[in-house]
Amino acid sequence: MRLVFAGTPEPALPSLQRLIASPRHEVVAVLTRPDAAAGRRGRPTPSPVARLALDHDIPVLRPPKPNSEEFVAELRELAPDCCAVVAYGALLSERLLAVPPHGWINLHFSLLPAWRGAAPVQAAIAAGDAVTGATTFLIEPALDSGPVYGVVTETIRANDTAGELLTRLAESGAHLLESTLDGIADGRLQAVPQPADGVTVAPKITVDEARVRWDLPAHVVDRRIRAVTPNPGAWTVIGDARVKLGPVAPESAEPLAPGAIRVLKNAVHVGTATEPVRLGTVQPPGKKPMNAADWARGARLDASVSAQ
């Protein structure tokens, strides 16, 4: 099939790579978000998907308004049989959705109807889910509600961060997307409506929401920190400094009041609503992440300081 691939960040790359290599499909263009400012100088930088497409001499479309009449007309001229979507980053109008005969097929990183929205991987970890996965479905105007073509499951490991889990889902999801498109091309796949029960939503997590709440149980603190690692990144205020935190580990140790700090020779504990947690890495402002015990020694941290 003639395909237009819509995607923007790194998790979309395995899918685009597989479709470029597929003997059954031709990626005639890539649709991605406009270049964004990056680096200290804020220079406009192409998205990871744009860079991969350019490396393969595939035309890159970066419309600031993808639902405009001009872009709808441009897409019609490309005459795609189908559009494949992986983390494109914009809602699509009904006029745009109607252009390809086989519609727009989205790869979503959850087992729909669970965790519809922008942050399904983070939501699954924060909720303590044991299993998640990826789903291919036909895009409809309502958010992540379209009929399903296929699913693949993935176990959530005890220490998974959102970044680690997303990396695995991006790979397994790429296989699923390719097989879904193969099945559509063959006429052997029929989409199945999502069940009405079991719908949960996963809106984008803000920086404010990534602040650690030490008044929660240790296992919840652990999950919530892993859910926002690496982005947007967990943080807390210790003394007068706002620091980013890597994953933590609940400790079977003497309890501490929520936010209270215990500095040991080779560890730093912070109190929660239950047992304390041991800090892993700490990143002070303007510095690289470092071992929490090394940071505490350098900062001359003591029990008079707490995490807020």
From Swiss-Prot:
Catalyzed reactions per annotation: L-methionyl-tRNA(fMet) + (6R)-10-formyltetrahydrofolate = N-formyl-L-methionyl-tRNA(fMet) + (6S)-5,6,7,8-tetrahydrofolate + H(+)
GO annotation, cellular component aspect: cytosol
Transmembrane regions: none
Tree of life domain: Bacteria
Coiled-coil region list: none
Keyword vocabulary terms for this entry: Protein biosynthesis, Transferase
Enzyme Commission number, as recorded: 2.1.2.9
Binding residue positions for (6S)-5,6,7,8-tetrahydrofolate: 110-113
GO MF term set: methionyl-tRNA formyltransferase activity
Keyword Protein biosynthesis: yes
InterPro entries, alphabetized: Fmt, Formyl_trans_C, Formyl_transf_N, Formyl_transf_N_sf, Formyl_transferase-like_C_sf, Met-tRNA-FMT_C, Met-tRNA-FMT_N
Family: Belongs to the Fmt family.
Function (record text): Attaches a formyl group to the free amino group of methionyl-tRNA(fMet). The formyl group appears to play a dual role in the initiator identity of N-formylmethionyl-tRNA by promoting its recognition by IF2 and preventing the misappropriation of this tRNA by the elongation apparatus.
HAMAP family: Formyl_trans
UniProt name for this protein: Methionyl-tRNA formyltransferase
Protein encoded by which gene: fmt
